[in-house]
Amino acid sequence: MNIGIAAPKWDKLSPREFLQLQELASYSTRKLQDVLREFSSPSAASTPKCIPDGDIDFDGFRRFLDAFLDCEAPLDLAKHLFVSFLKPNVTQAQLHGRALNQMAAISSTAACAPVTSHTKGSIPNINSIAELMPQCSGGGGGIGGTGGVAGAEGHAQARSSFVDKIHGITDKLHHSLGGHLSHDPSKTGSVHPMLTVTPSPLASGPSMFQASNPARRSVDSSPSHSATNHSQMSRNSSKKSSNSVNCKIDADIKLLARKLSHFDPLTLKVPLKDVVCYLSLLEAGRPEDKLEFMFRLYDTDSNGVLDTAEMDAIVNQMMAVAEYLGWDVSELRPILQEMMVEIDYDADGTVSLDEWQRGGMTTIPLLVLLGVDSTTLKEDGIHVWRLKHFSKPAYCNLCLNMLVGLGKKGLCCVLCKYTVHERCVQHAPASCITTYVKSKKPKCGGDLLHHWVEGNCYGRCSKCRKRIKAYHGITGLTCRWCHMMLHNRCASSVKKECTLGEYSELIVPPTAICPAVLDRQRSVNQAHKKSQMHHHQATHFQITPPDELSCPLLVFVNPKSGGRQGDRILRKFQYMLNPRQVYDLSKGGPKEGLTLFKDLPRFRVICCGGDGTVGWVLEAMDSIELASQPAIGVIPLGTGNDLARCLRWGGGYEGENIPKLMDKFRRASTVMLDRWSIEVTNTPHSDDMRPKVTLHSNMQKVIELSQSVVVDKSLMERFEEIQRQSKQVATSMGTAASSTSIMMASKTETEMETMATMEFGSSTTTTNRTTTTKSISMSTFETQCLQQTLRTAMSSSSSNTSSGSPCNGNQDAETEVDSHAAAAADVREKSVPRRSGETEKQSLETLLLQHKQQMQQQQQQQQQGVTSLAVEEAATATPVGSNQSDNSSQRNKQNNILKQQITLSLDLSDHEDEPKDDGGGAGDGTKSNGNSIPATPATPITPTTPNAASSVLQQQQQQHLQFEQQQKPIKVQSDKDCTVPYNIINNYFSVGVDAAICVKFHLEREKNPHKFNSRMKNKLWYFEYATSETFAASCKNLHESIEIVCDGVALDLANGPHLQGVALLNIPYTHGGSNLWGEHLSQKRIRKSAGPFGKSKKLRAGDKEFSATSFNSVDLSVAIQDFGDRLIEVIGLENCLHMGQVRTGLRASGRRLAQCSEVIIKTKKTFPMQIDGEPWMQMPCTIKVTHKNQVPMLMAPRSEKGRGFFNLLCS
């Protein structure tokens, strides 16, 4: 039967993707418990609440995975991992009628647990099951119901033929389901209650559907044990279902394959706790913590114990991870089965937390699977196991049998190479090496004895020089300390004392290390109390100098450097040296190792990592008082490795043999390296900062001003008509009363004042600038005319008011003021920059209509005022005249105040030195933005109201406050946003284009660290960002915003090609091998022309490369760069292309600017900067670089490949 005709839509996780998942988990710093708590808490606003015991869909699964990995996981990886958790978990509430029968037909190949060796090809089965589920939801009953029996007779023939095809698998499936669904974990048969390892594909791995009985779980077993385990599972069931299952198949089985393409596994859900358990195996941490976390996670009823199903679910995920890690599942399964039997110490059918942790910690393969750290030292004699694949035939040191397997065959101790099977590791003796002695006065003398490990010797005997035949079984002996290999028969002729071999002066023997005395241990505990909180090693050690000629190595390894080769080198050094000489920098830093070696008079430090690792160790050495300053060597594991190139250690570790490297460190010479101190001081912003006028902003203003004077012709005609009507009305009302005319004059004056104060700020801005187009000239001319007209109107109105003349003067002033107000309104509409034609048109029409209505109301009031005035004059006499004189004097004072306010607003517009506001208010009277001025109030304030003058003054004060707020300087950026990564320069410091590339590189690496897992990938990414920066040119015209002073002499950066970057070089190589200072052509010509008897030629004029200034009369063309001369080199970079040309050799060097001992750099804007490859964005500041000190470094010996007879003659 072949139902997998069509290819599945989704594939499971491949081994390559599993390695990628492991790598992503190693980059992450998030804790799985914290991520689960965030997803389970109801306060998480960004993500919906997830129940740990519930199921999640693909979207929730991907959010959880991204949160744990602290980056965006690849989509294909997330899909395939999600599918690996699917399984056909059938429940009574979800299977109806013929869906059960069709599922039973498929169950012969359906095993969808998270990927084991027997779960391949299960996705098509799941697809078929899920596709058939909607069709069966409406018909038939549940499992064992009457609906399935009712339709059995009509399909008897179909059932008969189908059962013949699948060989009775339906009955077996029914038998298994009927017994297991009613199974009670607390009620078991004669078999041990914890031993329920079954091959049922329906109960292995995470569930595909929502299960109504979550306790029904079991472990997918090996195919070789399927028959026995199946019967064993049946015996464990205390009850059997009395119902029968009748198969009803309407469609041919070939139709199942056709429906595969319509099924999408992403519509299903997977259990969240299975996902968490699976990921916890990949998370770094202590095995004890992982065991407790798994226990709490699967203890769904919170009763403090695990039953059989919960135990099986945990082991299920361990089996899935074990296969991807290269385990032989057939070897691991018996170990887990034995553990499940022995873990229940009180035989009560359940496992408590103590029993679970005790059983887990005594199962060595389980500890390796849980992620036990293979680099953490334990007590002497305890092996540090590591799962290993052997390229040559290997034999178990315990059972003496060969390790057989396709993947990783067995466990090997990292420290002594003791090798065992997984099944034998439980009984392996604690025979590992001793790394220290407990007393300074050993009982059996102070000599170190050989530590022999038998078997797996591939080489020649150190005594008889004959090859050791290790292919035929356990034969041969190897000393762990001196690495001497002997035949078994030759071992008796060798002394018992070990000499530590060829590199004895580099190794600290165990006899030289002992626990620290109490007083020192107490001081160390107090000094390192914070650093030791997360470490469980309570004993501190001290080293006694073993010999006057010894110079031991102190090795620091950074496993997270760019090449990701640290773990391998760490294990090799732990085997070649004393393990207490090797430290992992990711676990506490370098202080622990430096504290142990600080009293030694001679030792050397080896940094396995990039340039940042070297800087980290140098910084730690500054904080510790050492008896002597050790020399530092470098094994390049980083991306750039510029310092390693300068010291001849190469641009990257190429897998060279560790003994050869140790020989180079022994023969290396010592040189001095300068270190420079850098001080960065932020520049405070000046109070009178003005916005810089650029060409773009200037053209934008020209466009706005040219649009502001455009007025619709129809609106102009309407305005002129209304103005003519107002003049006629004013002329006809020649008999109006003086009080009424004064009131109207005051009203129009108030309107003019508010309009002028609102709009003269923007219109006078145009006056202060140089007019370049016709539109600007028009605006300026209209503004000047308006100012003159308003002054004339104010003078005439004030004179007419003070004189108290009758109707004629008031009528003229009234007409004049009305026309001026209309003109002000016209220019107001013109001076405001138009946002849209419709808005201006509507606002202007509204203004004209309001003016027309006001004129009509004034005409009616004046007609009523004439009649009332005649009656009052006839009835009143002298008292009325006195009151009128008092009112007129009060009105004169108010008019004088208004005149002063308008004059003040006009005078403010004439001052060019004061800051101006380029933005005007909207024409509709609303506040458009922060720079706009408040619009005119709806009800104008007249001088007859009591608070008229005070209201106008308040408006003026508010406007002045707004102008002051607009001109405040920008808030200074906080120091936290631009933190300098280092205060010491070891390699180089740069500003500009190269730092901009580095900023982009680091931001992308923090977002997607899995894309930067090799040196080649890092260089390709760097090239991509350099290409984009070439076109972006974000740091062009650097000379306009930076000043450089070298030893008191300012450099003229504007002389010559414009620069985009400046770099200060302490070492010759930067950016992964670029020699920016370069070796000039003149030096090459001198070296080639000067023979053994020849004289050097003079430099030609074309060979000289001058700097921007004649810097202290030093000819920079012949200046030689040296990282120990207490001088720093300053070079300029034109662009990214310039850097590439220097890197490829098309150009000799960068632009040499200076060679000095002190540099001061002042920047005027924010620039990208970097120190030794660590970038950041720096606001305007002052940078001072001075010499700090010198440290000894190890220079590798020259390569011997070039030596020979002909090279000797030519040298």
Swiss-Prot record:
Region (Disordered): 174-244, 789-841, 874-893, 910-958
GO CC field: plasma membrane
One GO MF term: ATP-dependent diacylglycerol kinase activity
The keyword Cytoplasm is assigned to this record: no
Bias (Polar residues): 197-230, 879-893
Residue ranges of every copy of the DAGKc domain listed in the record: 548-682
Recorded catalytic activity of this chain's protein: a 1,2-diacyl-sn-glycerol + ATP = a 1,2-diacyl-sn-glycero-3-phosphate + ADP + H(+)
InterPro entries (UniProt xref): ATP-NAD_kinase_N, C1-like_sf, C1_DGKbeta-like_rpt1, DAG_kinase_typeI_N, DGK, DGK_typeI_N_sf, Diacylglycerol_kin_accessory, Diacylglycerol_kinase_cat_dom
SMART domains documented for this protein: C1 (SM00109), DAGKa (SM00045), DAGKc (SM00046), EFh (SM00054)
Enzyme class: transferase
Entry's family note: Belongs to the eukaryotic diacylglycerol kinase family.
Name assigned to this protein: Diacylglycerol kinase 1
Source organism (scientific name): Drosophila melanogaster (Fruit fly)
